[in-house]
Amino acid sequence: MQALLAPVVEALGYECWGIEFLSQGRHSLLRVYIDHADGILIDDCEKVSRQISGVLDVEDPISSEYTLEVSSPGMDRPLFTLEQFVRCAGEQVKIRLRSPFEGRRNFQGLLRGVEDQDVVVLVDDHEYLLPIDLIDKANIIPRFD
């Protein structure tokens, strides 16, 4: 899906921050996160949604019913790629793993960066190197200071 939709988003002048496909029984949700240095407004989401809808209608990559949602990543932005983990180093993060690592699946702490294919997180004075392929979900924890 990334290979199909990212070029559409980028051709409009936005960054394709990430794509989620959430299966919810017979109806699913395709969520496309877009970003821009000047921020994202509802008009930006509408413009990108129209273009993506056209591509999806032609290519028809999803056989079931779904809803398309185009959104800003927001303050609690999800992290999808190693590059995003590098860009967000120094932020507080919440990470959920697909399976336990060192006896736990949930980590909340300071994102230190990336080493090879591992995301480095400091939790309670202990540094964890979490393999990127084990990460199910990761989000920035917004600061309000």
From Swiss-Prot:
Its main location: cytoplasm. InterPro entries: Ribosome_maturation_RimP, RimP_C, RimP_C_sf, RimP_N, RimP_N_sf. GO terms for cellular component: cytosol. GO terms for biological process: ribosomal small subunit assembly; translation. Keywords: Cytoplasm, Ribosome biogenesis. It is found in: Cytoplasm. Belongs to the RimP family. NCBIfam families: PRK00092.1-1. HAMAP family: RimP (MF_01077). Required for maturation of 30S ribosomal subunits. This is Ribosome maturation factor RimP. It comes from Azotobacter vinelandii (strain DJ / ATCC BAA-1303).
